Amino acid sequence: MENRIDRIKKQLHSSSYKLTPQREATVRVLLENEEDHLSAEDVYLLVKEKSPEIGLATVYRTLELLTELKVVDKINFGDGVSRYDLRKEGAAHFHHHLVCMECGAVDEIEEDLLEDVEEIIERDWKFKIKDHRLTFHGICHRCNGKETE
């Protein structure tokens, strides 16, 4: 975790920002909960447990800054709630998501399944793709299993 924090600190410094204690507390919460897709309120509640002096507005500002610097991605799964996801180190693209419409579970697909599609778009449309996001909405294997029982 400390290596990731050091890299994020360097990323902030390269854009003339500092990793303040408040920002570090927010980053640590994101790292500790990397498998989850936390809302700003979720992040705030977890930060508050360790650093009660940090306010909600500070957490919001920190998340917006981290989004702007591409340390995190701000995502919305169609439920009106923005969630924050740490960018995977070295990933050329944002990972994909499977969102269960029954239980709300969110699973991640790390593989870039759209390489062929990207090549066609770049070749035929002369469109230079910088990133993409793909979210599938359906019924997860856990809920699917319940239907057959």
From Swiss-Prot:
What does the UniProt entry say about where the protein is found? Answer: Cytoplasm
A Pfam family cross-referenced in the UniProt record is FUR
Region of interest (Dimerization), residue spans: 92-147
For this record, the Gene Ontology CC terms, alphabetical, are: cytoplasm; protein-DNA complex
Task: Answer yes or no on keyword Disulfide bond.
Answer: no
InterPro entries to which the protein is assigned, alphabetical:
FUR, Fur_C, WH-like_DNA-bd_sf, WH_DNA-bd_sf
* UniProt binding sites for Zn(2+): H37, D85, H97, E108
Ranges for the region named DNA-binding are 6-91
* One Gene Ontology term of the molecular function aspect: transcription cis-regulatory region binding
Q: Which domain of life is it from?
A: Bacteria
In which residues is Fe cation bound?
A: H93, H95, E115, H132
Q: Which UniProt keywords apply?
A: Cytoplasm, DNA-binding, Iron, Metal-binding, Repressor, Transcription, Transcription regulation, Zinc
Assembly information from the UniProt record: Homodimer.
State the family it belongs to: Belongs to the Fur family.
Sum up the protein's function in the record's words.
Answer: Iron uptake repressor. Acts on the transcription of ferri-siderophore uptake genes.
What name does UniProt use for this protein?
Ferric uptake regulation protein
